[in-house]
Amino acid sequence: MVDVLLSLTLPNDVAQDVEDLLLSRPDLVRGFTASVAEGHGSVVQLVEPGELVAGHAPRTQIRMVGPEENMRAVLALLKAQLPRANLFYWLVPVIEMGRL
């Protein structure tokens, strides 16, 4: 099986729901990394006054590696369970991974 990297960028207000969903499915997700991010650009809606002043919206980025089939199942699960979560995602092949 080919491993892929699934990256999710999402509004902070849904991050806990996404993390809880991922943690509930250890059969699909071995683990993940969540970090603070900032959304920039014309596709990012700035709503709060602080966002308008700063010019970016606070986001959370979650990354996980696993078999492509599992990562696609994660996307389907997110779409079914959190249809309005406003998630941006991408999948890329993993050439190599390991622990040093």
Q: What does each of the following model-derived ranges do?
A:
Residues M1-L100:
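Positively charged, small/polar-rich N-terminal and surface patches that mediate targeting and assembly
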